[in-house]
Amino acid sequence: MKHPSSLFSALLTLFFLLGATSLPAGITHGPALGRPGSDTMSVWARTSESGTFHVTYGLGPQALDQTSEIAQTQLDHDNTGVVTLQGLTPAMRYYYRVVTPDGHQSEVGTFRTWPSAEWARNAEYNPKGLFNYKFEFACGNNPKPESSAGHPMATYQTLFDRKVADEVDFAILNGDWLYEEKRDYPVESWIRQMRIDDADVPGFVRQCPSVTGLWENYKTFWDRSPNLRDWHRRVPTFYTIDDHEIINDVFGTNTPGYRNRRPVFRDIAVRGWIDYLAWSNPQRHEVPAYFGKARLRAGIDLLEDFEADFTKMPWKDMANLHVHWGGQLAGVMDPEQPIESADPNFGVYRIEEVIDANTLRLDRPLPTTSVSSYSIGRRAYGSFEIANTEFFILDTRSHRDLHDIDNPSREDLSILGRQQMDWLLDGLTNSEAEFLFIVSSVNFMVPHIGSGGGVDKVDDIKKDDAWTVFLHDREKLIEHADSLGKQVFVLTGDLHNSFAIKITDRVWEFASGPHNSINHSPPLDEGNRPANGPFLYGPRPCEIKWSTYAMPDIPRLSRRFPQYCIVSVNNVFNQPRNLGAENRWVAWERPYVMFQFYNGLTGELNYVETIHAAEQVMKGLPVE
């Protein structure tokens, strides 16, 4: 006998497919939390029809006595929307639920606001108002049985069993929240699901039909795991984009002349990623990608779009130009049959010149005459501060040159693109934080040169996803970070293993995960690195202090060793004057950060690394 909730879901899906129009608009996905702060929190939800919702919230699950502003859900964003709660009290536990105009309600969720400097300040012992906080980070949420630990996503159950959701102030999902599935979901099925007429289909969906498969991918993953849904309802999360959010093993998004289906799906993928996840992220550039229809002529290097005004575009806030592969299947990972591009002019282009409002000069002549779907990408990276720390959330996929694994030190190739790299270096230099976190979806010191025992998906370039094939960028960043006199932590994902690596006395790499994906095998996939000890891959030696490790003789589907990491930033300790008195926060002379790695199946503590802030002036009395 089917579980009642499964039966209801099946009947509801059937009702959608039959084109039902009598169901009221309701909440289909969410709520999820993001954009946390000491006096603010944002709430995301998706509705069955485009419309509105609001949030009721308060200090108890039965005392939701405050009401948010109205959020709008929009059809061209798959009926997703976000509302921000403001004027909240620091370090306070709240409860909330999403409500639609017809009274449809979500389950009750809960969150805790961040502390504030005023909340923690003590004029004598903590004049800066520092406070402690924790976050969880990992990568790799793959739920597909053929390449993961399966649908239940046991790590999230462990996180709840260990009450991690109640302890952490936020989480970082460091890439690969999504894995490709249902990417062939057709526009016609989406129309029925949305209960709209053909005339109501947004122009964006007509122009980029593969987006409906991407949206369905997100909804499928959300539907599949109650543990995952519960986590996002309780823990505000930041995200990096990695290859599976676009297409597995995506390279060369910034290399003019590169013609491959994977990179030119970038802008459609980033749009869906922001619709469902990265709405939560801080953004240095708020300008969205531009999607248009271009007239292209054979042998001519001009692009014409009579709906655009290129003279008014904020070019410093935008990325390069892609002519799309086209068609419904542009975003699938492994099509059952080879698929031909719907557009002979597809590829990566550089904009050389704005000729006039409707005309761009590109880096090369077009091979054929066509009317083509194209986009000019967005820049999806940013930073945020909390206490005495600053986080820089990178995009290692959207502005990435096509690497040269035989010449990894080439100065003309970049993993971030020059603009993002300059932003990062300037941000590190000008930051007033004591601890700096660089959040990179791909690994820093360990190569990613294998596919976990699977088959490489790109046959026109040798695989390496990591910074190890962009050594000029990596060494420049390490030297710059090491010169700052602060502790700098590079948080990484992508490789399905966890490790702690000391690069210099002040620069470290910590990789965490996977939450649910099959582990890679270091001898096959990671440059034959050791489980711990000295390691050299490229010009710079490092020390692997600890790692997870899957021996190559373990069958692929038996490599199920999920991990997660809790990071504790410790700035103060509590010293009330008397037992039961109010908190009195006293600042440590040298604050410290603890990286604690746990087994995702059992919650067993595997490893701890504690790192103190840079040396301070010696205190104490001389001994005669």
Which positions does each model-derived feature cover?
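Bacterial N-terminal signal peptides
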Residues: 9-19
